[in-house]
């Protein structure tokens, strides 16, 4: 029996996601033995700096992709939002399983909802996308950077100077913690999620036809199409981690893709937002980018990048 070595980051969430995919493949009767190999990525090592300052795409995937290209591992399960818009030659996304909840959530120390947080309340996030949208709706709140995996952030909320933190719902749901800790699910009108949020990407080598055939059985076409539209939009905007960019697509009753896309200034004072629909994921993503660029979003991105480079 062929042994499939699965690369994973060391966090509880990463290992939970990896084991979930392995379990699904076992249930389908995949003729493989599985072994998980833990890999430390650059993003895991740098925990005292915001992701936007570290810069560069693929902070949580590059080392894993190297291991795959070198034949040390055969596949890896990533959070889709960590995936760069373009994959290295020789690697592909073998499948996109059904999407988990796409929302961001607020977890507050005193169980106050977003609208009821007192003026001057300190909200923890390490995401420019989240902080920009939060400040756009509530400029009276204070943003304080917070890094670390989910358990670390939940501990910091209780023990440090935070009134609330914002996390992705999906990770909490996958860990089985959602019911115990979430104060409020934030609507996409308040906080549009990151591109790919809530979805997984199972990556493998392009020439591994046997494994690809089994991975395809886990693929969810609706999630795949929606996420493709989001990722095409992101690629066209050339934002990276240094710019507040958000995008969420779903499939409507007519099987059309409906994508809402957003670009903002870090202080939340400038926001460009468009909703585009259509049947072709690439066209929908491209059209959303075009509309935002025409309205001035590209000029904003260039300005943000210039300011980052000067720091």
Swiss-Prot record:
GO terms for biological process: protoporphyrinogen IX biosynthetic process. The keyword Kinase does not apply. InterPro entries: HemC, Porphobilin_deaminase_cofac_BS, Porphobilin_deaminase_N, Porphobilinogen_deaminase_C, Porphobilinogen_deaminase_C_sf. Its cofactor is dipyrromethane. It catalyses: 4 porphobilinogen + H2O = hydroxymethylbilane + 4 NH4(+). One of its GO terms (cellular component) is cytoplasm. Its EC number is 2.5.1.61. The keyword Nucleotidyltransferase does not apply. GO terms for molecular function: hydroxymethylbilane synthase activity. Keywords: Porphyrin biosynthesis, Transferase. The modification S-(dipyrrolylmethanemethyl)cysteine is found at residue 241. Tetrapolymerization of the monopyrrole PBG into the hydroxymethylbilane pre-uroporphyrinogen in several discrete steps. The porphobilinogen subunits are added to the dipyrromethane group. Belongs to the HMBS family. Monomer. This is Porphobilinogen deaminase. It comes from Geobacillus sp. (strain WCH70). The gene is hemC.
């Amino acid at each position: 029996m062929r042994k499939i070595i699965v690369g994973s980051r060391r966090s509880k969430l990463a290992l939970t996601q990896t084991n979930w995919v392995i379990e699904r493949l076992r249930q389908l009767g995949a003729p493989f033995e599985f072994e998980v190999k833990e890999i430390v990525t650059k993003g895991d090592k740098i925990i005292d700096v915001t992701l936007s300052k570290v810069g560069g795409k693929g902070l949580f995937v590059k080392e894993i992709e190297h291991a795959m290209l070198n034949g040390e591992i055969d596949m890896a399960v990533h959070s889709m939002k960590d995936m760069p818009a373009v994959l290295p030659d020789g690697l592909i996304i073998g499948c996109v399983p059904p999407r988990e909840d796409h929302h961001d959530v607020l977890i507050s120390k005193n169980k106050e909802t977003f609208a009821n947080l007192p003026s001057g309340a300190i909200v923890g996030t390490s995401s420019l996308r989240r902080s920009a949208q939060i400040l756009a709706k509530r400029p009276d709140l204070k943003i304080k950077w917070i890094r670390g995996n989910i358990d670390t952030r939940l501990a910091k909320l209780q023990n440090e100077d935070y009134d609330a933190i914002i996390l992705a719902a999906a990770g909490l749901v996958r860990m089985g913690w959602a019911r115990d800790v979430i104060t409020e699910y934030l609507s996409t009108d308040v906080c549009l999620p990151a591109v790919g949020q809530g979805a997984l990407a199972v990556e493998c080598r392009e020439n591994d036809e046997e494994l690809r055939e089994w991975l395809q059985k886990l693929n969810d076409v609706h999630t795949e199409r929606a996420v493709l539209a989001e990722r095409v939009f992101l690629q066209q905007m050339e934002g990276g981690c240094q710019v507040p960019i958000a995008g969420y697509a779903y499939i409507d009753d007519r099987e059309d893709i409906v994508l809402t896309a957003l670009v903002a200034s870090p202080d939340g004072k400038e926001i460009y937002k468009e909703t585009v629909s259509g049947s072709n994921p690439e066209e929908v993503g491209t059209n959303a980018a075009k509309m935002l660029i025409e309205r001035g979003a590209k000029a904003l991105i260039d300005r943000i990048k210039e300011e980052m480079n000067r720091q």
